[in-house]
Amino acid sequence: MILVLLTYKVELSEIDALRPAHVDWLKQGLADGRLLMAGRKVPVTGGLFMARGTLDEVKAWAAGDPFATAGAADYDFIEVAPSILAPGLESLGQ
């Protein structure tokens, strides 16, 4: 599993203009089984998502995010090997 932290590099007005396409991209990731969860940082300085796949696979997938293609965010990728999981989240350890 890969945790991806996004930090916005542009004004929120630019992020807001890109957000509908970004959300569509995230929804496609859910449908494809790649995306596990996504959300905004509080305060709104970026966001994060968790994705299935190898580091290289997730980096390649994230390159298609409209925030990435517009150069609107920096991405930090953290590979995670879950070992303790709440009930119902066991599949994240696979």
Language model regions located:
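Conserved, structured core segments of small domains
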Residues: M1-Q94
